[in-house]
Design a protein with these regions (language model features):
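Exported/periplasmic ABC-transporter solute-binding proteins
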Residues: 1-196
Length: 196
């Protein structure tokens, strides 16, 4: 819409975030390879035993098609591999009666889902959920900062190209050590030097 209105947008990266896979804390699996993740969500692997877990059917949980999580899952993780159909649930709609929507993650012993690290560790922290390592690399702040963890996205400030001086000052402040320390304090991974 900005382009249609003749507005040019400027994207300024200021933080890093990891796309993570979550399982029940009691699941004995601690790490999956990138290929195993693709195989699980494409339906090629259907039992946890195949990847070193218990002899249980894998219960996959997805996100709605128009969500940021689903977009990252399809573009960075699955690449061109088709995903199995998501689990659905029926909900009441004022306009359409009962409609089917993608079901929310349920943290059963055989579940696997995905989200962003910030959501899993800050917004919706749950001691019964475990974040999996990928290729043996845990989604720690250090592994996100140094780029070792394979699924990383940058967070951007989006402004008009011709921003006001107040907006310019705010953008510049977020890139200072003080601004980057705030980024870190709230649970994201800073891109630049912090005060800490």
């Amino acid at each position: 819409r900005a382009k249609e209105s003749g507005v040019t947008l400027l994207y300024t990266p200021f933080a890093r975030e990891a796309f993570v896979f979550i399982v029940n804390a009691d699941n004995p699996v601690n790490s999956l390879t990138e290929q195993q993740v693709r195989d699980i969500f494409s339906g090629a692997i259907t039992n946890w035993r195949t990847v070193g877990g218990n002899d249980q059917e894998i219960q996959t949980w997805q996100r709605p098609e128009d969500s940021g999580s689903q977009t990252v899952m399809q573009s960075q993780v699955m690449k061109n591999v088709r995903m199995i159909s998501p689990q659905e649930t029926e909900v009441a709609s004022m306009m359409e009666g009962m409609i089917k929507v993608v079901a929310e993650y349920r943290n059963t012993n055989n579940a696997i889902g995905y989200t962003f690290r910030y959501y899993a560790t800050q917004m919706n922290a749950d001691k019964n959920i475990k974040l999996l390592a990928i290729n043996g690399i845990a989604p720690t702040a250090e592994n996100i900062r140094n780029g070792k963890y394979p699924y990383i996205v940058d967070a951007f400030m989006v402004t008009r190209e011709n921003m006001t001086s107040e907006t310019q000052k705010l953008v510049e402040w977020f890139l200072t050590p003080q601004g980057q320390s705030l980024v870190e304090d709230v649970g994201y991974v800073p891109m630049y030097k912090t005060l800490h």
